């Protein structure tokens, strides 16, 4: 279910009263992409609506951090033929193949920049949770899963840092591969969560 601008503002107002100062927004297909307009669904916000949300939150002392998935949870991207070359699996279109680093960087550099343009926060969340298809494709099956994860996340962090932003990821997958944490950027921020 997509929240309306007014509903998000009501939520922000409630958060402000509770002295909460950060709101993470995952837009998916409701972000008003321009170069990648194929991704927008019929409920997509306009650019001015996103600016209105961010401005309102800022006026309440709430920082809006955008979450733009680039690894798992990319169904709304990978279902389109234009992005089919990035799929980890031809039938299950939820995850980007971590060996397609250069192709993915090209696409997500553009997507990240569009999202970042409307969010002054120094932080940029790239998701990376529930990448359960790691090692599914024939090429990936020959590579260690933690290696696949680390190399891909390092590449996406580079793209985030090119914009002058600090990257954030969910911590669930790296907690399954704790041996790999030393290889990830030292300034990468991990957000832990559970299924409650």
Name what the model sees in each region.
Residues 112, 175-178:
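A generic local structural motif
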Residues 180-196:
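Aromatic- and acid-rich polysaccharide-binding/catalytic face
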Residues 1-171, 183, 189:
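Substrate-binding cleft of carbohydrate-active enzyme catalytic domains
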Residues 172-175, 195-196:
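Short beta->alpha connector loops
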């Amino acid at each position: 279910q997509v929240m309306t601008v007014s509903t998000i503002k009501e939520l922000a107002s409630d958060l402000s009263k509770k002295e909460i100062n950060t709101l993470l927004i995952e837009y998916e297909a409701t972000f008003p992409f321009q170069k990648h307009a194929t991704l927008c669904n019929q409920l997509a916000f306009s650019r001015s609506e996103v600016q209105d949300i961010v401005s309102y939150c800022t006026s309440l002392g709430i920082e809006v951090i955008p979450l733009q998935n680039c690894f798992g949870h990319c169904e709304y991207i990978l279902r389109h033929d234009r992005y089919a070359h990035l799929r980890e699996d031809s039938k299950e279109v939820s995850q980007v193949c971590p060996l397609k680093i250069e192709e993915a960087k090209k696409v997500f550099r553009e997507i990240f920049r569009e999202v970042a343009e409307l969010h002054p926060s120094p932080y940029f969340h790239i998701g990376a949770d529930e990448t359960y298809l790691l090692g599914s494709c024939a090429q990936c099956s020959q590579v260690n899963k933690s290696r696949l994860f680390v190399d891909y996340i390092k590449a996406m962090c580079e793209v985030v840092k090119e914009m002058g932003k600090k990257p954030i990821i969910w911590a669930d997958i790296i907690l399954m591969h704790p041996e790999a944490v030393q290889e990830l950027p030292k300034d990468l921020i991990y957000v832990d969560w559970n299924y409650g």
